[in-house]
Amino acid sequence: NEIGGVLIWKIPDFGFPPGEVDGFISRAKGKHTLILDLRGNPGGYVVTLEKFAGYFFEKDIKIADLKGRKPMDPQMAKSQGSNGFSGKVIVLIDSHSASAAEIFARLMQLEKRGVVIGDVSAGAVMQSRGVGFDAGSANIISYGMNLTNADVIMSDGKSLEHTGVIPDEIIVPSGRDLAERQDPVLSRALEIAGIRIDPAAAGKILPVEKFIERRSNVAIQLIW
């Protein structure tokens, strides 16, 4: 039997095409709670973040302003209307959650759309662009660099750079938790959703090893 209608969605990164979001969100239809595990998520495509965020709001939402040397359009989330998810949302983050992952987590806090639990995020959100170069004549050597071109300012007027997102509930796994593969963060998220599962059992739901080898894929786990 399904336990409480909770869907856990582990998202290793936002480096997937925005068109794939539709199929992922459809899995959440009919569930009363969606737990988004963004722990270890380094970020990804801005267009994917914008499309993804739009599924959680009934109206278009400004995600953040971009502050650069020249005027820039803000990051916007266009509401997906009836195709969106209207249930409870719980977001898990840690010190390795960066860029798009922490921007999304902070957006959910500011709009009072979800609860964020875990550890303070990385505080690495500045937007950058890649620049490529070639050197040499007979033997061409290609190299490149990323140049920061804008800071990201949230709706409260603050940047997350160097500060990160402070969770609504700070829960940091201990060394013993990690050694024994317990997950007190996911356990607490499930408790908020109305399901009591101890950290040891929660640690078996989303094993860390499962996602180290599949960082380019989005994994979905339904609690049964």
How would you name each of these model-derived features?
Residues 10, 64, 117, 146-153, ...:
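Residues in well-ordered beta-strands of folded domains
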Residues 31-33, 164-171:
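Short acidic (Asp/Glu) and glycine-rich catalytic loops that position anionic groups and cofactors
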Residues 1-138:
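Cleft-lining beta-strand/loop regions that shape enzyme active-site pockets
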Residues 130-132, 137-162, 166-167:
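C-terminal structured "cap/appendage" subdomains that terminate the fold
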Residues 12-13, 95-96, 120-121, 149-151, ...:
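A broadly conserved detector of short glycine/acidic/proline-rich loop/turn motifs that flank catalytic sites
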Residues 126, 161-163, 176-180, 184-224:
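Conserved functional hotspot residues or short segments at active or partner-binding sites
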Residues 86-88, 170-174:
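Flexible glycine/proline-enriched surface loops and loop-helix/loop-strand junctions
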Residues 108, 157, 189:
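Hydrophobic, well-ordered secondary-structure elements that form the walls
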